[in-house]
Regions:
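N-terminal presequence-like segments and the immediate start of the first folded domain
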Residues: 1-71, 77-130
Length: 130
């Protein structure tokens, strides 16, 4: 896996400008803040992020992938201000579950998610080396 950083560009904080990798591609559907049985245990933004990341890691494991194989993450949030306000807690959960691994990443505010209680949805692509 190669993290792409054009010469002279400021290094982004918490993500990479791009990633190049080859191997077995694993696509993880958008994971939200409910557990494996479809039950929400919190309406707290950071709490839902923690659960969504836990769900991502669980799905990756089914393919023999680990967090360090993630090459791209897309975060859909319903409230940008809640996302920004929870940066610290999100960072703690991210480092605990994903580690110090910062793939290409996009965060987008959306009007709503299909599940009404969901505040965040995280979609992931990973590439497991062959």
């Amino acid at each position: 896996m190669e993290f792409l950083q054009p010469p002279g560009w400021a290094r982004p904080r918490g993500y990479s400008n791009g990633v190049a990798a080859s191997g077995r591609t694993v696509c993880v559907s958008g994971m939200i803040g409910w557990d494996g049985q479809g039950v929400f245990h919190t309406d707290d933004f950071a709490g839902q992020v923690r659960q969504a990341l836990h769900n991502v890691v669980a799905v990756l494991a089914e393919a023999g992938a680990r967090p360090e194989h993630i090459v791209r993450m897309t975060w859909y949030v319903v409230d940008k201000n809640a996302y920004v306000a929870a940066y610290r807690e999100i960072g703690l959960a991210y480092r605990e579950l994903i580690g110090l691994h910062f793939p290409a990443m996009t965060a987008v505010q959306v009007v709503a998610l299909v599940e009404d209680r969901a505040q965040v949805e995280i979609e992931v692509t990973a590439i497991v080396p062959l």
